Amino acid sequence: MTRENLEQIAESENQRRAEFRDGINVCVATGCLASKSQMVKDALDREVANRGWEKHCQVKGVGCLGLCSEGPLVSTRSGALYKKVIAADAGDILDHAGKAPLHRLLCSTDIPFFHDQQKIVTENSGVIDPERIEDYIAAGGYSALMKALGEMTPAQVIQEVTKSGLRGRGGAGYPTGLKWSTVAKAVGTQKFVICNADEGDPHRVIEGMLIAAYAVGASEGYIYIRAEYPLAIKQLRAALPQAEQLGLLGTGICGTSFNFRIELRVGAGAYVCGEETALIASVEGKRGTPRPRPPYPAQAGLLGQPTLINNVETFASVPPIIRKGGDWYAGIGTEKSKGTKVFSLTGQIRNTGVVEVPMGISLRKMVFEIGGGIPAGRKFKAVQTGGPSGGCIPSEFLDTAVDYESLAQLGSIMGSGGMVVMDESSCMVDVAKYFMDFCMIESCGKCIPCRAGTYQMHRILSAITNMSATPEDLKMLEELCDLVKHTSLCGLGQSAPNPVVSTLKSFATEYKAHIEEHTCPAGVCGKAVGANL
């Protein structure tokens, strides 16, 4: 595969697309599939065939169109976006193809949810068919790899990534360039690249891994994905052989001496395998439990060899950095948190879905502009960031910038981009118990502080929500939070107390009401099982 070959594929695909008078894109990502978008696509395909429009109208399944709360979503080449589409709407949609939009299904795109985003990682989402490599190439795919292999040395690639200020998008935000540099300098008989993946644009992730492997001198890669994501597994199983067939994976990649292959590893689903050393153990076929560090994976990871581990969003950020330059990327975001971040915006909010925003955007803008605010006239209470181990942030901190340092100061984390909004109907003690229940179940049990500590914290939280706790229990809960945070082996245990610590700090009156007055101010405890999110 040469640059000329790549350009020929892109030109051929663009010519093929131009032959269609009209184009209809159906979101077939997980959220819309759950709302039966596959039935919508099938109905559109049938209607096109019945009308004999196969040469005039292209119906394509695409990645997430973003506004999941309005799914199934369908977009058209003329720019219309349709919401809550059902199979029976297929005929009407085709009747309006290339004409005035179908107003009864029209979803306004002139809202902050869409125009306040800055799409870099998700630029292909909703545009290309993730299972067709030709679609990806036509959108500029693999051009960054060609540039890296043909115009840059491995050291220059690392320099560009370092210059960009990119930080790991899966957790603590470790500088990506520094991690790559450490692996590149490490001595070993072989080096590995591992991607921790649950979702993603498959060829974008593969391209990012290829560039990383070239930069650090790795010859083998693994994409680790949990079994409960069958769609992502299906798409990756289609993408890997496509890349191999075009000479983008394997030996002598793009006519160079660079060799790299990628193998897909499906995990059993343990949350703790998000921790690097636990993930490595799982890839090796062992039980997914973390080990003490040092040595770090960069020095001694998979099979004891230097190993680079990043998550999907980190790898997906690399191709545009190589294409446009590190300075371009560093110009987005804040002084210490560069670029954009993808969030899954959910909870008690009008607009739920997947958004990509510049680092430094305020929580207020996320909730009340992009998210559309709180429905049913209720009041905002808190937003929880960073997944099950994140902290709950109250209304007085809504003007906080969304970046690594600012969230850490509030006792929360960026994590992989979860953002859950809660209103006045949520009991924050019940919320803390809900997340602690998850951490307790997901603890691998290797270290006593996490294994026993999460159990004891959950026991006390259960007693509080059952109105049977004492002030001594509350004191014990605070002591346990500190103990588990500072003595657990890995990030799961170290961050498990975050929801408790943050709610104790910002919603202490709710804890006291449960213990001293035996009442739940939100009216949740004693009525429902699990958090009212």
Give residue spans per PLM region.
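Ferredoxin-type iron-sulfur electron-transfer modules in oxidoreductases and energy-metabolism complexes
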Residues: 1-22, 37-61, 78-103, 138, ...
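Conserved phosphate/anionic-ligand binding catalytic regions in large, soluble enzymes, centered on
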Residues: 29-33, 161-183, 269-281, 285-287, ...
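Short acidic, glycine/serine/threonine-rich loops at helix termini
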Residues: 37-38, 69-75, 172-180, 233-238, ...
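Short amphipathic, charge-patterned alpha-helical segments
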Residues: 48, 208-210, 360-375
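Flexible inter-domain linker/hinge segments
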Residues: 101-163, 310-325
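Accessory "access/gating" subregions that flank catalytic or transport cores
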Residues: 146-187, 330-331, 336, 344, ...
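Histidine-anchored nucleotide/phosphate-binding helix
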Residues: 201-215
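Hydrophobic alpha-helical positions that pack around
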Residues: 233-359, 371
